[in-house]
Amino acid sequence: MVQELSTPIIQTLICSLRESQTDGLRFRHIVKEITRLLLNEALKNAPLISKDIQTWRGRETYEVLDQRSYVVVTVLRAGMPMLESVMEALPHINSGFLAIKRDETTHKSKLYYDRLPECEGKTVIIVDVMLATGGSLCDAIDIVKTKKAKKIIVLNIIGAPEGIDSVKMSHPDMDIVISQIDENLNENKYIIPGLGDAGDREYNTIE
């Protein structure tokens, strides 16, 4: 299932991301804000557990997410603000990291680092800013599936139809929650209109 959350607020935030004047600090902040909206939508029907807490009225029980049953995984480095946003909302969630680099000539992706916690029987939330060709995301999903995750949810800020179709073809069971689906990929496999290089813009490494 692919769900696009192209609401007026999200469209306004995405427009700010597209602006070339938006600096790294502001860019990361907007990415985190959009991620919180995506997370809320992705988990709106998630099961809850009872939690007994001390309040100003004494001991009381409330329904909450079982944070230990979730893992958030980011594809370095553009996805780091998204991971931070998820962990700010769910501070007891476990986190994992994948480093996948795209060959600019072949446009194929290559994994060069992975650090994942125990995923068996858990819901894994994969976060990445852009879904272009879908190669990196398919690789990430393949890796997480070997860890016997119960369910995988993908959160993306923007994506191209070609990449979404590629992921759906390889992983038809995948749930993707995305804030904006852009027009297409150009001849260099960049998303149009896109955001530019999200990692460079987040961390001020644009040459």
Model-predicted regions and their roles:
Residues 1-207:
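PRPP-associated nucleotide enzymes
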